[in-house]
């Protein structure tokens, strides 16, 4: 089994412009988070895959998740990812090509395969992925986070989800 020894050290820091058009602070991120879904999924599958893939991104590095939320009445809510997430779609071949490019560039990525729709727990999910060679994975989605220009090249050919 091939093990990817490339690593992409990505900075969780941001650069900021002090004032945007609305008078509010504008935050610009050095990295980009993208989910690419296969373009023939059912709506429930799109949501399910996106949720699972984003759990991989959110837990992949400390500092990606912001502070907890609190409303004016003092109710606390869980923290969320600090930066926006783009959701895109692509055909089977473009999705496989994006996976290969991400691996080649050392971009950490989460994968979701067709087989995971029929598994019932985390261990079974890992077993289903482990049973298939990388080039033969029946991908329905990937999620990645890395430097903007690298991620843009990796997902070239995908289009915004609409």
What are these regions (language model features)?
Residues 2-162:
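Positively charged, small/polar-rich N-terminal and surface patches that mediate targeting and assembly
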């Amino acid at each position: 089994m091939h093990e990817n020894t490339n690593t992409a050290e990505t900075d969780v820091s941001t650069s900021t412009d002090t004032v945007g058009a609305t008078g509010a602070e504008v935050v610009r991120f050095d990295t980009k988070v993208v989910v690419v879904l296969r373009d023939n999924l059912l709506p429930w599958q799109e949501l399910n895959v996106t949720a699972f893939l984003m759990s991989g991104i959110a837990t992949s590095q400390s500092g990606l998740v912001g502070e907890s939320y609190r409303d004016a009445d003092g109710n606390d809510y869980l923290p969320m990812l600090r930066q926006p997430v783009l959701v895109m779609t692509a055909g089977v071949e473009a999705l496989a090509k994006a996976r290969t490019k991400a691996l080649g560039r050392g971009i950490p990525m989460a994968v979701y395969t067709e087989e995971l729709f029929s598994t019932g727990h985390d261990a079974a999910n890992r077993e289903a992925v482990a049973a298939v060679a990388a080039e033969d994975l029946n991908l329905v989605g990937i999620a990645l986070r890395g430097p903007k220009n690298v991620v843009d090249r990796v997902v070239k050919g995908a289009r915004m989800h609409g």
